[in-house]
UniProtKB/Swiss-Prot annotation:
GO cellular component, one term: mitochondrial matrix
Entry protein name: Lysophosphatidic acid phosphatase type 6
Tissue-by-tissue expression: Highly expressed in kidney, heart, small intestine, muscle, liver, prostate, testis, ovary and weakly expressed in thymus and colon.
EC number, as in UniProt: 3.1.3.2
Cell compartments where the protein resides: Mitochondrion
Impact noted for substituting residue 335 to A: Abolishes enzyme activity
Amino acid sequence: MITGVFSMRLWTPVGVLTSLAYCLHQRRVALAELQEADGQCPVDRSLLKLKMVQVVFRHGARSPLKPLPLEEQVEWNPQLLEVPPQTQFDYTVTNLAGGPKPYSPYDSQYHETTLKGGMFAGQLTKVGMQQMFALGERLRKNYVEDIPFLSPTFNPQEVFIRSTNIFRNLESTRCLLAGLFQCQKEGPIIIHTDEADSEVLYPNYQSCWSLRQRTRGRRQTASLQPGISEDLKKVKDRMGIDSSDKVDFFILLDNVAAEQAHNLPSCPMLKRFARMIEQRAVDTSLYILPKEDRESLQMAVGPFLHILESNLLKAMDSATAPDKIRKLYLYAAHDVTFIPLLMTLGIFDHKWPPFAVDLTMELYQHLESKEWFVQLYYHGKEQVPRGCPDGLCPLDMFLNAMSVYTLSPEKYHALCSQTQVMEVGNEE
């Protein structure tokens, strides 16, 4: 859980991508007319060839970002930081252009908070490392063993990796790769990161002025909403937290999730209200960034959707040079990325995204018709995206549904720099 910073980079000209999307749509319409006339059956999945996989994942279990103001504090022992031997895998971090790793203001902030026991706030633990290794093993089973899609050893020509410039995400990526490739590699592992003020792998409230302004009023009044307000007061009273302490459902959930993931002794009342705390954290998030507020959702994850979309279009474009396409794209993100991302795709289940959760996007081509399809999985379960007839979605239908929220870098910067913005929710 973080509050982010936004701006955007991309590699393919917008005009080219638009033309590709239009041609794809026209071809799809023509095929649909033929199929309707001939009364053809649904797509034969045995004739589908996997062409590309994109995986967005949340980091593994970590220490809380901010301790609760309680007399009895949970002890976070540095032994929890021991690195499991099977997760050891060397990597290098660069900026998006391949230059030196950018400075990480978030890691500096986390090191200002020392928890009882000696750990810093927001540190990936061995539990989190094992979770990420297990996710990597699942991906290996899916794309190396069950389907011989990826090489069994890491090949930099097949895999592109990008992470937010936060240490727990970089280390989570290391562990995932160790599980996926069993610590075997044919070349250097490069993890690409961006500057905090231009990051788009999370909603960048710090740099996107309009997003910050549109949601400011709702952030200030979220804890005062009917239902949320009463439940927050009840939890704080039962836990002995003073009403003046700035503790909301986000902070409560952050602590209860971290403690439960590590089986640490917790405040009994925190455990008792765990389910309600999660639900109210979700309610609060949806109040701040509601699905009806299209522009805010666009600014929150539109640039990231644009990256995912561009990868899809480049993969299906025969003119794209082979060295510009990877079989696997990995993106290390956060819970605050997942909620708006899942909302825009129409698959949010109203549960807080857990540690090490993944959203996997597969791109297929039909061997006979040459048509393209997308398949989505969240937390390992097949999903039906908004605007799609079923789990196996024609690419043009998927892109059309995404286009409601996708933002090119130019449009993103234009929206973020608007000077006249009504603060959503301030007039309620």
